[in-house]
Swiss-Prot record:
Protein's UniProt name: Thiamine transporter ThiT
UniProt subunit comment: Forms a stable energy-coupling factor (ECF) transporter complex composed of a membrane-embedded substrate-binding protein (S component), two ATP-binding proteins (A components) and a transmembrane protein (T component).
Originating organism: Bacillus subtilis (strain 168)
Top-level lineage group: Bacteria
Gene3D superfamilies, A to Z: 1.10.1760.20
Keyword Membrane listed: yes
Taxonomic classification: Bacteria, Bacillati, Bacillota, Bacilli, Bacillales
GO molecular function: thiamine transmembrane transporter activity
Length: 192
């Protein structure tokens, strides 16, 4: 990759990181959960960069999003390992959706709606599931004391985190499908 393409990729990563953080802060003002988490479209910029540039750019954008969240203090932290799971691992994991970049781009370019929807929803599902898994582990280990008496810690963590992750997954999948059906050029990068 030549220097100008690298520069474009780095600028896009920076812009999408900022967009993800801003979207998360704004959504947290309206739909914030008591022990952290919110229904949010903050994953959209990370998915977008993953589809444009692939897994490495997606992982980088997610990692930077988590680091910026920590740096600005937009977090709910109990322990350093919990911080790592809920911010670094969870947000970076969204970038794994870049594994679907090729199929998403091909479906968008060929204007095959069915394939585009399947590719986007699959990618968003995997990215969301990996993020959810990091939050569930963190919740079970570090927030078990919040579980109602008699409720197993893992059940509490699975349920609590699903209350915001499932709607976030659905909203992100719908928005990205609509976005790419109407503007497939957003998926083009200098890499493609």
């Amino acid at each position: 990759m030549n220097q100008s393409k690298q520069l474009v990729r780095l600028i896009e990563i920076a812009i999408m990181t900022a967009a993800a953080v801003i979207l998360d802060i704004v959504s947290g003002m309206f739909l914030s959960m008591p022990q952290g988490g919110s229904v949010s479209i903050m994953m959209i910029p990370i998915f977008l960069i993953s589809f444009r540039w692939g897994v490495k750019a997606g992982l980088t954008t997610g990692l930077l999003t988590g680091l910026v969240q920590i740096a600005i203090g937009n977090l709910f932290a109990q322990h350093p390992v919990q911080l790592l799971l809920d911010y670094i691992v969870a947000f970076a994991a969204i970038g794994i959706s870049g594994c679907f970049a090729s199929s998403v781009r091909k479906a968008a370019v060929s204007k095959t709606k069915g394939k585009l929807i399947v590719s986007v929803v699959s990618a968003v599902f995997i990215g969301s599931l990996l993020r959810y898994a990091a939050h569930v582990i963190s919740g079970a280990v570090f927030f078990g004391s919040f579980a109602p008496k008699g409720t197993p810690v893992w059940i509490y963590s699975l349920t609590y985190n699903a209350t915001y992750m499932v709607p976030s997954f659905i909203i992100c999948a719908i928005v990205l499908c609509l976005l790419f059906m109407t503007a497939p050029r957003l998926l083009k990068s200098d890499k493609a």
